């Protein structure tokens, strides 16, 4: 289902800066105040901690996050690009519906995402959840 909400011009270029240049550790996207487009809200520095990522998730508002998730597996340092659809239970129902119906347009435009995670509360966006999903692939 598509909501008709467009992507701001810098959404994909900012993603490519993360994917190709490792310029960022994460990108936080949101729907603009006028509900017309998905915009880059902020970025996380390259090498940011997992705690920095979780602190950027608002308690009552939906966000999309692309995270360059760093982890160790069998002693080797690895990373995967994860897409997080953050839609907390406490968010406004209309905004949750809008965020859910708009997610695919951003997700499909960001070519190279390896893992997708949906979160409605803090228990679904723990480091252990990411690690489990990333090591299954």
Curated annotation (Swiss-Prot):
UniProt KW keywords: Actin-binding, Cytoplasm, Cytoskeleton, Nucleus
Q: Keyword Ligase: yes or no?
A: no
Return the CDD domains for the record.
ADF_cofilin_like
Q: Where are the transmembrane segments?
A: none
rRNA processing listed as a keyword = no
Instruction: Tell me the Gene Ontology biological-process terms attached to this UniProt entry.
Output: actin filament bundle assembly; actin filament depolymerization; actin filament severing; cell motility; hyperosmotic response; response to bacterium
What's the main place this protein lives?
A: nucleus
Database matches in PROSITE patterns: ADF_H
Give GO MF terms, alphabetically.
actin filament binding; actin monomer binding
A GO CC annotation given for this chain: nucleus
Subcellular location, record wording: Nucleus matrix; Cytoplasm, Cytoskeleton
Q: List the disulfide bonds.
A: none
Enumerate the spans annotated as ADF-H domain. Answer: 2-135
Q: Cite the Pfam families for this sequence.
A: Cofilin_ADF
In the record, the note on similarity to other proteins reads: Belongs to the actin-binding proteins ADF family.
The UniProt function text for this chain reads: Controls reversibly actin polymerization and depolymerization in a pH-sensitive manner. It has the ability to bind G- and F-actin in a 1:1 ratio of cofilin to actin. It is the major component of intranuclear and cytoplasmic actin rods.
What is the protein name stated in its UniProt record? Answer: Cofilin-1A
